[in-house]
Amino acid sequence: MGRGKTPNLGEFRVATDQSASRKISQFCVRLEAKQRLRFNYGLTERQLLKYVRIARKTRGSTGQVPPQLLEMRLDNVIFRLGMASTIPAARQLVNHRHILVNNRIVDVPSYRCKPKDIITVRNRPTSCNALKGESPGGGETPDHLTASLSEGSRPTGLVNRIANRESVSLNINELLVVEYYSRKA
């Protein structure tokens, strides 16, 4: 009688952690590297594939080109300058036409910045209010960018040069991303 009512704990098998004992495949390693890169920059699969295809066409190391292209995107430059707290917030600033590049309104977050580009905030109250909580230079500004305050305490940024591998703060093996996409294209 007592045996039917109380479960015998010895009869249940102890579940082993199979994920720790199983070897991770090379596909999984490449997929994780690609997903880390994608989610860090807030890109869609198609956008990242486009950057990898551009990298294949260029001369030099194919693995170093996608991070350079991603670091030179306008939304990422605004984030690195400290004008926005996150990359999605930087995308919103650009989409809402608060950002000027070389004194021209740019509303495309994927705009590729070039050396000597000057990035400022529009001189209107709503643009200044959008940046109230942000402060330029709050974090470590990469060496390919320069952050400052212009007249009227508007945040300003300058792109000194194209980003190199040292200025990219991600711990991702870019070759794994390129290898992942070598099957697709």
From Swiss-Prot:
Major subcellular site: plastid
Any Gene Ontology CC annotation: small ribosomal subunit
Keyword Transcription regulation set for record: no
InterPro entries tied to this protein: Ribosomal_uS4 (IPR022801), Ribosomal_uS4_bac-type (IPR005709), Ribosomal_uS4_CS (IPR018079), Ribosomal_uS4_N (IPR001912), S4_RNA-bd (IPR002942), S4_RNA-bd_sf (IPR036986)
Chain intervals for the UniProt region annotation (Disordered): 132-154
Alphabetized HAMAP family for the sequence: Ribosomal_uS4_B (MF_01306_B)
Assembly with partners or alone: Part of the 30S ribosomal subunit. Contacts protein S5. The interaction surface between S4 and S5 is involved in control of translational fidelity.
Family: Belongs to the universal ribosomal protein uS4 family.
Listed name of the protein: Small ribosomal subunit protein uS4c
Origin species: Woodwardia radicans (Rooting chainfern)
Gene that encodes it: rps4
